[in-house]
Regions:
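A long amphipathic alpha-helix within ATP-dependent nucleotide-binding catalytic cores
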Residues: 247-259, 301-304, 308, 553, ...
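Active-site nucleotide/adenylate-binding loops and adjacent lid/helix of ATP-dependent enzymes
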Residues: 463-469, 473-623, 673-677
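C-terminal active-site "lid" helix and adjoining low-complexity regulatory extension at the edge
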Residues: 634, 658-671, 685-689, 698-754
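Loop-rich catalytic cores of soluble enzymes, especially ATP-dependent carboxylate-amine ligases
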Residues: 8-10, 105-106, 116-134, 138, ...
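A short glycine-rich, hydrophobically flanked beta-strand micro-motif that places a catalytic Asp/Glu
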Residues: 96-102, 317-323, 561-565, 572, ...
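Sequence termini and other peripheral, non-core segments
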Residues: 1-37, 41-54, 323, 327-438, ...
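Terminal catalytic/cofactor-binding subdomain
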Residues: 1-129, 136-138, 175
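ATP-binding N-terminal substructure of ATP-dependent carboxylate-amine bond-forming enzymes
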Residues: 414-482, 486-489, 508
Length: 754
């Protein structure tokens, strides 16, 4: 089968960069002194029997982070960043993720085999420990997975003389594997990052520093007698089967190679069902990167893989791969600043890269990547191992690694309410994604702008929008809650108290109502908006001018407006989920407190500098505005934004206390009388709501409530209620909501938590 020169035949407009990617990252858990953590795998990470994203490798303290399939290298790194964030915040706060491939100083007896449920997996790890030793098992790395794009493969297939797609793909991936092993030394030279081993790691003295112990025969490799041919797929499959039959290997996965064929459960299935993708297993962790691999490395490797396809396959495969192994060993164990040996043929690599970039018209970015490769070939100072040299102290990188680990740990806990890499999404959705990853529920973002997610476990699929809009609420329930008039009628029919008032569809109608309310405390609000938009509250009778302004503000948000009686008391938000109150929040209206020096405008700016405050529901607290509503509120109190408040003087900028309009959040779940929680849950149930925010005005929360004597008034029901404000509060312990959403949607996962 002719596979050589196929890329050269493709049209320049062919989708040469089309591919799917996945990353697996191993990392040890250590304490703040850089010693191995002896705690079990975190129970909050769910059952390892099915977790798709966070597993343990050989050791109980060796985490393995696995991304979903991504359509770009950028997306793969984004996935890995989020999973790393979840892992970093799921382990103990006193634990860190070790950023090096080589472990800290360890003793063999410290290493505990992963405590897995699967009996074979436990037996397999004990077997490996006995055969290869335990310390080698603590070496960690990155596995880079790539599947050539469907359209790219089809274009290559059309240029070939083949009629069998499976056979063609097998030949294509076999050629790529052959050339990858032939030129494996390129990866070791450019990206090797294991220059030293900590004291007593090896039983014998070894010269150091080197480029990569992990990628040499000092790393985790098979016994020398295990020699598997890549000359053909049949040879590969048969050789491994023979070693297993003879007892030299216990399982197919015990054959360790820098590249592994993937996509089938057993190797022999590759012959008739085909190779789906390749796993490249020889990447050291890059300690300069929080997630262990940089964007430029991901893209450079992608370009190199295409160059390996551009190059012809070796004529004598076994001989070429043996030479490639010997060269890789020499380069791996050479000093990081030692130039490449003469037998390292860099010219054919750089020529292939140049021709590839030129043929397909790749732009400045990829041309820059090629230049970086050329620069590194010419000067080893540009390699990763060389960059680590200044950080080696007394033949150790332990201090450097611990410093990096602490830095990355602190980053994980900075803005800990957000999911790293997904900060532009709505905050409740970020929190739900965090919990989904933590619990081991598969996720796909169907529409990032619309906050629309697909979640699944095995065959069970759920769709979630905006964090808590699910199939559990029928279509009409959010529509009813969006219409405040309908909400009031349903609650009234169910016997629950609501404010008296009327509805208007024009400014003229609203103004005509003024004589009836001119001496009353009132609330003016849009009929069908959420998040406190367009609401004005008058605790003192409103002038006609101010009343008109309030109507105009409300009509700017909706075509219909409600004017209701103002109910005195304290407003609380009750979060109801599936008929149960899960959280109660006291919300304090947007405010500033004077210091006798700064204007109200300056005080607002100071308060907005709080890192918990942001915009568009992506932070636990919202930025405080100084718009029409706030300035009207100031006018009613006799102030302007440029007035200086006396020290200790508190001024509210809003009557309504919504967090979404700059208010502060106080969690009172534990102190709120259960009777009010039950009453709020009953109100949500009367609407048929699964997830619902119930706003109650309570004059005296020390008086127990009942349906007959509620001692409160429901001023609003909210569909798609915010969840973040209950979890990350200005005061109080906070209540986790998103995890309970997932437990309700996937009870089978909740019951499998470790």
């Amino acid at each position: 089968m002719t596979i050589n020169q196929l890329l050269q035949k493709l049209e320049p407009t062919s989708p040469i960069l089309q591919a799917n990617f996945g990353i697996e990252r191993e990392s040890l858990r250590v304490d703040r002194q850089g010693k191995l953590a002896h705690t079990p795998h975190p129970s909050c990470l769910g059952a390892r029997s099915f977790h798709p994203y966070i597993q343990t490798d050989f050791c109980e303290f060796q985490m393995e982070l696995i991304t979903p399939v991504a359509k770009s290298t950028t997306e793969a790194r984004r996935f890995l960043g989020a999973i790393t964030d979840v892992a970093g915040r799921s382990i103990s706060k006193d634990e860190l993720l070790w950023p090096l491939s080589m472990p800290p100083r360890i003793k063999a007896q410290e290493i505990q085999v992963a405590q897995l449920e699967n009996e074979f997996e436990r037996h397999y790890r004990n077997y490996l420990a006995e055969k290869y030793g335990t310390k080698l098992q603590a070496i960690s790395g990155i596995h880079y997975n790539m599947e050539l794009g469907k359209d790219l493969v089809e274009a290559l297939f059309k240029e070939s003389d083949q009629t069998d797609m499976i056979a063609f793909k097998n030949a294509l991936y076999l050629k790529l594997a052959q050339n990858y092993l032939r030129y494996r030394w390129v990866i070791t030279y450019l990206f090797g990052a294991a220059p030293v081993a900590e004291q007593d790691f090896f039983d014998q003295e070894v010269p150091e520093p080197v480029r990569s112990f992990r990628n040499s025969d000092h790393g985790y490799v098979n016994k020398e007698e295990i020699q598997v041919s890549f000359a053909s797929l049949e040879d590969y499959v048969s050789a491994i089967e023979n070693y297993i039959e003879q007892g030299d290997l216990i399982a197919e996965k015990e054959f360790y190679s820098a590249v592994r064929f993937r996509g089938q459960k057993v190797n022999r299935s590759f012959l008739d069902k085909g190779i789906t993708y390749l796993e490249f297993r020889n990447f050291d962790l890059n300690p300069f990167e929080r997630i262990g691999i940089s964007q430029t490395t991901m893209d450079t490797v992608h370009l190199l893989l295409l160059a390996f396809l551009w190059l012809d396959a070796p004529e004598n495969v076994d001989q070429a791969l043996a030479q490639g192994h010997a060269l890789n060993e020499k380069i791996a164990l050479s000093h990081p600043l030692e130039p490449l040996p003469s037998e390292a043929e860099t010219q054919n690599i750089t020529t292939a890269l140049d021709q590839l970039v030129q043929h397909f018209g790749l732009g400045d970015y990829h041309q820059g990547l090629v230049k970086q490769v050329k620069d590194a070939f010419a000067d080893p100072n540009h390699t990763l191992a060389a960059q680590l040299l200044p950080h080696i102290k007394d033949k150790s990188l332990a201090d450097f690694a611990l410093d990096k680990a602490l830095t990355y740990h602190d980053y994980d806990w900075t803005a800990h309410y957000a999911l790293k890499g997904y900060e532009e999404m709505e905050l409740s959705t970020q929190m739900l994604l965090f919990d989904a990853i933590q619990k081991g529920i598969h996720f796909e973002i169907l529409d990032e702008q619309d906050q629309f997610l697909k979640l699944w476990h095995k065959d069970h699929v759920e769709y979630v929008k905006n964090g808590n809009m699910t199939s559990k609420d029928n279509y009409v329930v959010p529509l009813a809650m969006a219409n405040k008039t309908v909400t009031k009628k349903i609650l009234t029919d169910a016997g629950f108290p609501v404010p008296a008032g009327d509805e208007f569809t024009s400014l003229e109608q609203g103004l005509a109502y003024y004589p009836l309310i001119k001496d009353k405390q009132i609330v003016v609000k849009p009929k069908s908006t959420n998040f406190g938009l367009g609401i004005s509250i008058f605790q003192e009778p409103a002038s006609l001018d101010n009343y008109k302004k309030a109507l105009e503000i409300a009509f700017a948000e909706d075509t219909a407006v409600l004017v209701e009686e103002f109910i005195s008391g304290t407003e609380y938000r009750f979060f109801i989920l599936d008929g149960r109150c899960e959280a109660v929040l006291l919300r304090v209206a947007a405010n500033v407190v004077g210091d006798g020096k700064h204007t109200i405008r300056e005080l607002v700016a100071q308060k907005n500098a709080n890192p918990l405050r942001g915009r568009d529901h992506r932070s636990p607290l919202e930025i405080i505005a100084l718009g029409d509503i706030e300035q009207l509120m100031l006018t009613q109190q006799g102030y302007t934004p440029d007035d200086i408040l006396p020290e200790g003087k508190k001024v509210n900028l809003r009557r309504n206390s919504n967090i979404s309009t700059g208010g502060d959040s106080i969690d009172v779940t534990e102190t709120m009388d259960s009777s009010y929680q039950e009453l709020a849950a009953a109100m949500a149930t009367s609407m048929g709501a699964w997830a619902c925010g119930v706003d109650l005005i309570i004059p005296d929360e020390t008086q127990p409530a009942s349906k007959e004597n509620p001692h409160c008034t429901c001023i609003e029901l909210n569909f798609n209620p915010s969840m973040y404000m209950h979890t990350y509060c200005a005061e109080g312990p906070g209540q986790a909501i998103t995890s309970k959403i997932l437990d309700k949607l996937f009870p089978e996962v909740a019951t499998n938590q470790n």
